[in-house]
């Protein structure tokens, strides 16, 4: 893929590619593609794509997720809430607690098979 990526104090599963991004203090399962994004203190399950310029901190994601470029989660509680509200509009048949959850400590969980678009 050509762009140098960094895996710092982290574990990357088989098939994981970090292209031009940085992953720090995190665990990435199989077939995670980090495309010029920053991930910190997170657990990312199988088959997740994280788009360019996205930033994650304290995120636990399930599998089969697509994160569009420029999504920022875990840095600003108000912005995190806006993403949750947006997801409710994108997936009207799902209950809010089936989409994204935010703990009082700021840990964000994302369920399987969703896309998160930049707002």
Regions found by a protein language model. Give the residues of each.
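Left-handed beta-helix
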Residues: 1-119
């Amino acid at each position: 893929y050509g762009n140098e990526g960094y895996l710092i104090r982290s574990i990357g599963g088989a098939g994981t590619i970090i292209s031009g991004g940085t992953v720090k203090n995190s665990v990435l399962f199989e077939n995670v593609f980090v495309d010029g994004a920053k991930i910190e203190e997170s657990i990312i399950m199988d088959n997740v794509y994280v788009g360019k310029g996205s930033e994650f901190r304290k995120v636990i994601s399930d599998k089969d997720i697509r994160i569009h470029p420029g999504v920022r989660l875990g840095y600003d509680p108000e912005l995190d809430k806006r993403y949750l509200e947006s997801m409710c509009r994108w997936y009207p048949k799902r209950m809010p607690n089936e989409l994204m959850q935010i703990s009082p400590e700021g840990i964000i969980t994302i369920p399987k098979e969703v896309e998160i678009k930049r707002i």
